[in-house]
């Protein structure tokens, strides 16, 4: 596919609140300004999401301002058991009061109350993630401090319009392969993220979304022969004719991919026989209601042959919310990738049991 690369610095939106330039970049070039948005203020969504992982466990932290609703979230995942717990306090009508930074490059953000606090501190060469929650799992508290190093590196940046609404857009940066150190304390245990074994990813998102969306997202960060390596893959919403968000990262350089397809296995939800009894003179009508079988092995294929992977799930961090007008069905599946990825110069990177995740999320929001 032909993809448009953004190469110059300029504002993200024009005077009518429309994207000036759709496409991808390898750094955050366009300037996001919440006050330039012309869509309804309830449609604005902003979030910072961090995932820090090693081979044995992971922690995920979110601070989000979705205008009509603010969300803070802490997840702890233990791949050895496997086990996971997510607790996500929500607040009504935050409407930008959380003041999430207009750039991923600078600015701090914190959110909480007397029961918890999550804080992201952005320094020039590193980031500090501090958090605690008194009642994370029942009455069990959790706390943690993570340091992410920020070496000079390229990243995945994409500006995606929505064909059905000209003032809707999604401006997103994914920063992979940030070396991580730190620890999490929970239930009398210490989960230590050790140097050289632990890596983080930032999902920095700002935009105006349409009401009903489905997205697919996959990510991995680690090392191959002590060289930083990872990827971002995804699709499912908006007008992606300008560019995909699929990208490899090797030795802090980005390598652009074409289209990648998530092949999630399916299974029968139910089997119903209608129309009479079976037999020579009978009529049999069978319906199969197929749903995703998230815990069976997946595959990933690409139109350019540069990302071909098998994926063996470990745990499905699933959650579902349905309160009529607001609905969310999320399946973030952690597992291990095996296969090949091809860099821009044709170098083939082969991976085996490489930790990462892949997810499918449906939202009415």
Can you describe what each PLM-predicted range is?
Residues 1-365:
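Structured soluble/peripheral alpha/beta segments that form catalytic or ligand/cofactor-binding pockets
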